[in-house]
Amino acid sequence: MRECISIHVGQAGVQIGNACWELYCLEHGIQPDGQMPSDKTIGGGDDSFNTFFSETGAGKHVPRAVFVDLEPTVVDEVRTGTYRQLFHPEQLITGKEDAANNYARGHYTIGKEIVDLVLDRVRKLSDQCTGLQGFLIFHSFGGGTGSGFASLLMERLSVDYGKKSKLEFAIYPAPQVSTAVVEPYNSILTTHTTLEHSDCAFMVDNEAIYDICRRNLDIERPTYTNLNRLIGQIVSSITASLRFDGALNVDLTEFQTNLVPYPRIHFPLVTYAPVISAEKAYHEMLSVAEITNACFEPANQMVKCDPRHGKYMACCMLYRGDVVPKDVNAAIATIKTKRTIQFVDWCPTGFKVGINYQPPTVVPGGDLAKVQRAVCMLSNTTAIAEAWARLDHKFDLMYAKRAFVHWYVGEGMEEGEFSEAREDLAALEKDYEEVGVDSVEGEAEEGEEY
């Protein structure tokens, strides 16, 4: 079996975890108490959903997941919520004091007290796996636990499980709205620390998702529940090929092989279609061509940036539902003829396709319409460098005045770490710039240097 272990860190990670597991349970027909009426084989570990759920002798299905937060309130909601019986109490780990939006607290002072406990729980989960394929880590960039503790955990996972892939789902600080003043510091410190430990990081920015909820679902004031359910759909689409049988299935390592041209350039942009409310869906027939085109609209992206200004390096289309290869090929052929979509010249084909016959499931009483087919596009584009540039600029404004730095130094960090992290991100921006340059020009320039 190719099992995946999900690790949800901090408030954002835990709340997205709730949305994801709620959706997985609905998709697989697993009840909140872990029973699965449709699964006749007790303890049989060969069903494809066993990548995400382990099965006890009593026929109970337990998520292969760990929830960690440095303060108890958010995880307590899981402990008392609808799905409280689904999780083993040991999978829900909380500390007593908050990381207080401070990377240094999450990474050094408070994080180090709890990290061994978390790794121990992860080890117990990995012992139940026959062929662990990797970890999915959910966290935010802006919070103290999400930035500091997640990066500490990933460093330690690299030591203990060197060869296993680690995929991140990270909540990137929104351009306009901010939940903490020190977000730019935390984001840049965590990106610098995890850059070498993460194999692939899918970024999601709250503002982009707010806009999608407002525009496509007509929700005037989207709540985090609305956002998380939408994020849940996306995560579900990315992991669907691991949990269901399909025509063209995609494995965790396959994402990396097809999306990451260079180790550092591992931040694919995620687009999902169709996001549509129930009343609208009733009147529209969403064909494969339509949803494929929708993926290339910046309005459907999960991070605010404009791919029309950048170039695509690789593109992964994950279809689910009533989709046949013939339609997909036709849709992609049409996309390739459009001038607005530019690929780097060193990557001529650039499309990888996955097809899964399980149609998208929606949460009852949610905002999304039940549709016959959906697509999630993961694209590695140079445009995402805009997001880094934005963040770096905010960091520079604050760091020039050394604002708030004493909180970090007081928790045992050194000021040198700030400048080191900032230099690393400057290098990352440069890397993105260089991949986008056409190779022919590049060769000519190299000739002049010698």
UniProtKB/Swiss-Prot annotation:
GO terms for molecular function: GTP binding; hydrolase activity; metal ion binding; structural constituent of cytoskeleton. The keyword Methyltransferase does not apply. The modification N6-acetyllysine is found at K40. One of its GO terms (cellular component) is microtubule. A motif (MREC motif) lies at residues 1-4. GO terms for biological process: microtubule-based process. The record marks Y450 as: Involved in polymerization. Its cofactor is Mg(2+). It is found in: Cytoplasm, Cytoskeleton. Some glutamate residues at the C-terminus are polyglycylated, resulting in polyglycine chains on the gamma-carboxyl group. Glycylation is mainly limited to tubulin incorporated into axonemes (cilia and flagella) whereas glutamylation is prevalent in neuronal cells, centrioles, axonemes, and the mitotic spindle. Both modifications can coexist on the same protein on adjacent residues, and lowering polyglycylation levels increases polyglutamylation, and reciprocally. The precise function of polyglycylation is still unclear. The active site is at E254. Keywords: Acetylation, Cytoplasm, Cytoskeleton, GTP-binding, Hydrolase, Magnesium, Metal-binding, Microtubule, Nucleotide-binding. It catalyses: GTP + H2O = GDP + phosphate + H(+). It comes from the Eukaryota. Its EC number is 3.6.5.-. GTP binds at Q11, E71, S140, G144, T145, T179, N206, N228. Belongs to the tubulin family. Dimer of alpha and beta chains. A typical microtubule is a hollow water-filled tube with an outer diameter of 25 nm and an inner diameter of 15 nM. Alpha-beta heterodimers associate head-to-tail to form protofilaments running lengthwise along the microtubule wall with the beta-tubulin subunit facing the microtubule plus end conferring a structural polarity. Microtubules usually have 13 protofilaments but different protofilament numbers can be found in some organisms and specialized cells. This is Tubulin alpha chain, testis-specific. It comes from Oncorhynchus mykiss.
